[in-house]
Amino acid sequence: MADEGNIISNLNLEDGPVPNGADTSPAIGLISQYVKDLSVENPNAPESYQWAEAPDMAVDFNISARAIQPEIHEIELKINVTSKGAQGTAFIVELAYCGLIGMRNVPDDQAHPFLFAEGPRILFPFARRIIADAVRDAGYPPLMLEPIDFNGLYMQQLAQAQATAEATPAGEA
């Protein structure tokens, strides 16, 4: 009885190793993640703890990426949270959370979506926890941010950029 479809017996080793031991297969990995900047402001404490009205919450975020070395990139996820009521600002939390990503043999058309969609998706739960803890440590109930569809936002911005490029007449860029 032959196991022709068995993963152990069908390793596709016919091609052999790449000359000189070169590894040409694409690889992406998270090297490290860290808080680059964290600011918590509680400008109206302790009076703000007595405010009865529900505050308005504003959450803004931004994503940036830069090459540190040819195969290492830094993704920076900035999240700013402001809680305001009629009586003033309760708290402001500003976080810059980063990840170092190792990328080897990844084409640019695949690296860009990873750096601006998948990478932030990986980092977000950790940033979310830091913000919840910072708000709690400021004396308020922990703030649990809603999940963000980074892939959907990336695709939306890509479509907008393509539409803008198509609307701009040639020679007027």
From Swiss-Prot:
Localization per Swiss-Prot or TrEMBL: Cytoplasm
Name this polypeptide is given: Protein-export protein SecB
Known role: One of the proteins required for the normal export of preproteins out of the cell cytoplasm. It is a molecular chaperone that binds to a subset of precursor proteins, maintaining them in a translocation-competent state. It also specifically binds to its receptor SecA.
Keyword Disulfide bond belongs to the record: no
InterPro entries xrefs: SecB (IPR003708), SecB-like_sf (IPR035958)
Family label: Belongs to the SecB family.
Swiss-Prot/TrEMBL keywords: Chaperone, Cytoplasm, Protein transport, Translocation, Transport
Pfam families (UniProt xref): SecB
Organism this protein belongs to: Novosphingobium aromaticivorans (strain ATCC 700278 / DSM 12444 / CCUG 56034 / CIP 105152 / NBRC 16084 / F199)
GO MF entry, a single one: unfolded protein binding
Highest taxon in the source lineage: Bacteria
GO biological process: protein folding; protein tetramerization; protein transport
Cellular compartments per GO CC: cytoplasm
Encoding gene per record: secB
Major location (coarse): cytoplasm
Known partners and oligomeric status: Homotetramer, a dimer of dimers. One homotetramer interacts with 1 SecA dimer.
